[in-house]
C-alpha cells in the first residue's frame, strides 16, 4: 500500500502578485523552491489562511531572493495580494518508507524570506 504524506510546505507565505492574464501557476522565489525541494512544474496545494480558499496548481521558478509568490491564471481569482497562504506538496511512499520519512517545513517572514526550517510540527495544545 502507498500513502500520501506531506513532503514539504512553505508556511504563511505572503502573496506578492496576482496575475490573472498570465499562464496558470504559482511563481515561487527560487530560494524557497530549493529549501523545500519543490521542483518546477510540480503540483502544489495552496491553502489561503486569509480567506479559506483551497486549490491546487503547479510551481514555476521566480528570481532567487526576490520574495515573489505570485498566483497566476485562474488561481489568481482565489487570492489577493497580501493574503497569507500555505504552499504544500505531497509524496507517495510505502508504509516502510513513511516510517522514517521527515517532511521539509519552511517558515517565512512577511517578505517571504526564510526564518527557520523544521521536520516536525509542534504538538497542538488542547
Curated annotation (Swiss-Prot):
Per the entry, what this protein does is:
Catalyzes the pyruvoyl-dependent decarboxylation of aspartate to produce beta-alanine.
Subcellular location as annotated: Cytoplasm
Q: In which pathway does it act?
A: Cofactor biosynthesis; (R)-pantothenate biosynthesis; beta-alanine from L-aspartate: step 1/1
Task: Cite a single GO BP annotation.
Answer: alanine biosynthetic process
Keyword check for Cytoplasm? yes
Q: Which UniProt keywords apply?
A: Autocatalytic cleavage, Cytoplasm, Decarboxylase, Lyase, Pantothenate biosynthesis, Pyruvate, Schiff base, Zymogen
UniProt's post-translational modification comment states: Is synthesized initially as an inactive proenzyme, which is activated by self-cleavage at a specific serine bond to produce a beta-subunit with a hydroxyl group at its C-terminus and an alpha-subunit with a pyruvoyl group at its N-terminus.
Could you tell me which residues carry Pyruvic acid (Ser)?
25
Per the record, its GO cellular-component terms are:
cytosol
Q: Which cofactor does it need?
A: pyruvate
What EC number is given for this enzyme?
A: 4.1.1.11
MF terms in GO: aspartate 1-decarboxylase activity
What interactions and quaternary structure are annotated?
Heterooctamer of four alpha and four beta subunits.
Which organism does this sequence originate in? Stenotrophomonas maltophilia (strain K279a)
**UniProt record similarity statement:** Belongs to the PanD family.
Substrates-to-products reaction catalysed: L-aspartate + H(+) = beta-alanine + CO2
Give the top-level enzyme category: lyase
Query: What's the protein here called?
Result: Aspartate 1-decarboxylase
Cofactor: record remark: Binds 1 pyruvoyl group covalently per subunit.
So where's the catalytic machinery, residue-wise? Answer: 25 (schiff-base intermediate with substrate), 58 (proton donor)
- Keyword Lyase among UniProt keywords: yes
Q: Which residues bind substrate?
A: 57, 73-75
Amino acid at each position: 500500500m502507498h500513502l500520501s504524506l506531506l513532503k514539504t510546505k512553505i508556511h504563511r507565505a505572503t502573496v506578492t502578485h496576482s496575475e490573472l492574464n498570465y499562464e496558470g501557476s504559482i511563481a515561487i522565489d527560487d530560494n524557497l523552491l530549493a529549501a523545500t525541494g519543490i521542483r518546477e512544474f510540480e503540483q502544489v496545494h495552496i491553502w489561503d489562511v486569509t480567506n479559506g480558499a483551497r486549490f491546487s496548481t503547479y510551481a514555476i521558478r521566480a528570481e532567487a531572493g526576490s520574495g515573489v509568490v505570485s498566483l497566476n491564471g485562474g488561481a489568481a481569482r482565489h487570492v489577493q495580494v497580501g493574503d497569507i497562504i500555505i504552499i504544500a506538496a505531497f509524496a507517495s511512499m510505502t508504509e516502510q518508507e513513511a516510517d522514517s520519512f521527515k517532511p521539509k517545513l519552511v517558515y517565512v517572514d512577511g517578505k517571504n524570506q526564510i526564518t527557520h526550517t523544521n521536520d516536525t510540527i509542534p504538538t497542538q495544545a488542547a
